[in-house]
Amino acid sequence: MTNPEAIAAGTPIPDPLPDTPVLLNRSINPEADPETCSVYAQDRWNLTPGTFESHVEAFGLNFTAVPAQYRAAVKRYFWCLINIDAPRRQRGGTVRRLALRSIQLAFRAFGAFVRWLHTNGIHGFGAVRREDLERYLSEVLAADVSVNTKRDLLGEVVRFWGYRLLLPEDIRLPACPPWDGADLRDLLGDPATPGVNRTPRINTDTI
């Protein structure tokens, strides 16, 4: 499943089967109840069996919150995020695969992007244009949220782009890196950055 030659060639990973374990390439806590281990076809994924903390509160991913037309694509991406090392490390990052807790947080930030696409009449990741990403950037920058939240919202789009060659063509973002590969610190750090329209405001309900 994680054949490095396939990854190097940009070959998409084969579709998981309905009964493929969600935590296929993760260590499972030996004390976890096997009945609580999710499979790919389920719309709620329990990530708790992959943690080794004592008395951990159950957590996971709820795909029923994702617009129906995006659900299959988002499940495919997050299954890769859980089980496959990132083809490219995030700028400033130190890991190739996120901790499961971090994946839960990534799901929330990425969900805001998906809902924004849906609200704006963009009917799939393959239909996203560079102009759409520029508009999302502008609205995130103008949103009345913290800089850290803005960094998370933009960073998850960049992370998704980094997995594009492992995904089917119809759920890939454009080949050019989002925002021409600009460092998020540059995008977020200078309120007077030229050429960025900050007038529109992203709906905070989307976030």
Where are these regions (language model features)?
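Charge-rich, intrinsically disordered N-terminal extensions
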Residues: 1-207
